[in-house]
Amino acid sequence: MSRNLSEQPYVHPSAEVTQSTLGRWTEVSERTRISDSSLGDYSYVMQDCSLWCTTVGKFSNIAASVRCNATNHPTWRPTLHHFTYRASDYWEDASHETEFFEWRRSNAVTIGHDTWLGHGSTVLPGVAVGDGAAVGSGAVVTKDVAPYTIVAGVPAKPLRERFDRKTADRFQALAWWDWDHARLRVALDDFRNLSAEEFLEKHGG
């Protein structure tokens, strides 16, 4: 990622983005597939990822080989195979099962602002990852992740909070991710050098 980004999203030629919206200063890397999703300003998705029916906030850091909304199969039916809901692929006189796809879409994934999804992690349908949360490499996230919480493992479990709850609440109230590009540049040294408490005190959180 050693290129100059801009308000125009960057999508690698080998990536595929369909029926989705990409914010300003965003980047989609090699061989990644994004469909029916949205990517907030400044967020990036590294190589070989798959996002479907997922809303990603601003400043999200998505490492390589991440899967968001790994779709479910019908475990309650006599067969798991998709011929039951993709029937028109197999028979000219059969149709796809609209209700099944609507059920899948009703279990969208939400990824908050300033989040980090580690390499090879998977976020299952219907899960929400809160603002400021981090997901460890290889984790399988089956339940909602609280804001500013670090989770890891299979299934993912909380390891610790990034900050105490009061500090986390102050960051969410500050909502620095909504600052404009010029203000972010002015605060760059503070992001780099101040502690969380010092940053909040200076910037009114």
Report the location of each language-model feature.
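Acidic, glycine-centered active-site loop in nucleotide-sugar glycosyltransferases
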Residues: 147, 152-155
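Flexible, glycine/small-residue-enriched loop-and-beta-strand segment within the central core
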Residues: 5-22, 27-125, 154
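C-terminal boundary and immediately downstream tail of ABC-type ATPase nucleotide-binding domains
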Residues: 174-182
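ABC ATPase nucleotide-binding domains
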Residues: 183-203
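A generic "structured core" feature
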Residues: 130, 134-136, 140
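Conserved catalytic-core motifs of eukaryotic protein kinase domains, centered on the activation segment
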Residues: 72-74, 145, 161-163
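Short, charge-rich, low-complexity interaction segments located
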Residues: 154-163, 167-168
